Amino acid sequence: MAAAAAGEARRVLVYGGRGALGSRCVQAFRARNWWVASIDVVENEEASANVVVKMTDSFTEQADQVTAEVGKLLGTEKVDAILCVAGGWAGGNAKSKSLFKNCDLMWKQSMWTSTISSHLATKHLKEGGLLTLAGAKAALDGTPGMIGYGMAKGAVHQLCQSLAGKDSGMPSGAAAIAVLPVTLDTPLNRKSMPHADFSSWTPLEFLVETFHDWIIEKNRPSSGSLIQVVTTQGKTELTPAYF
């Protein structure tokens, strides 16, 4: 791609742009002089533009609000990538008192954001563009100790594969790819698990660089791929998950 080789400024939407990974994406792509918009419940001052998500218990309200505001922001402009890096974690088995609350939270953090990002891709992503979704390696199997998390991430995986199918509504040549990490090396994770083996955690910079490569179509997996992100003794590898 001549444009990529020339270092053309790209346009990217980061859903979850104030989270640990989202903030790194905004920083890194702004440093390349790309136009980067953050979509989150709070503004990211480093972003080129912001869409602030209103907190609500109604999915349709939130989806309509974000869709309308992104539409106003972009107009007829298309973006090169939509990176959905929103999410969170909550534990609990089927007997937990917090089961319903945690399932609700996981659904909002993972499925609401992924579904809205997917719809935004059908409206605003360039042909040949990139949509990434945040899955989880753990959700390739049963997750009895974190029921809500596993269900939500499993749904993200299914969504990703659906978007890759014929007549999904995605732009021509665009790719939907889910990244399935184990544990990301974030300040919050270090604080909550201070005695863990950090050499098995994935550095945020690795994912940022991976997204960059995929945006410029370098080593980009095929649409619908579920890419496991596994770090062992400080070395991170990307491996497709097969069923």
From Swiss-Prot:
Molecular function GO terms recorded: 6,7-dihydropteridine reductase activity; NADH binding; NADPH binding
Disulfide bonds: none
Sequence positions bearing Phosphoserine: S172
UniProt GO BP: L-phenylalanine catabolic process; tetrahydrobiopterin biosynthetic process
SUPFAM superfamilies, per database record: NAD(P)-binding Rossmann-fold domains
Keyword Phosphoprotein: yes
EC identifiers of the protein: 1.5.1.34
Residues forming the catalytic site: Y149 (proton acceptor)
Pfam families: adh_short (PF00106)
Chain residues that bind NADP(+): 13-37
Reaction equations catalysed: 5,6,7,8-tetrahydropteridine + NAD(+) = 6,7-dihydropteridine + NADH + H(+); 5,6,7,8-tetrahydropteridine + NADP(+) = 6,7-dihydropteridine + NADPH + H(+)
A GO CC annotation given for this chain: cytoplasm
Modified residues (N6-succinyllysine): K72, K78, K95, K101
InterPro entries in the cross-refs: NAD(P)-bd_dom_sf, Sc_DH/Rdtase_CS, SDR_fam
Superkingdom classification of source: Eukaryota
Keyword set, alphabetical order: NADP, Oxidoreductase, Phosphoprotein, Tetrahydrobiopterin biosynthesis
CDD domains named in the record: DHPR_SDR_c_like
Keyword Chloroplast found: no
Function comment: Catalyzes the conversion of quinonoid dihydrobiopterin into tetrahydrobiopterin.
Protein family: Belongs to the short-chain dehydrogenases/reductases (SDR) family.
Protein name (Swiss-Prot/TrEMBL): Dihydropteridine reductase
Organism, as annotated: Sus scrofa (Pig)
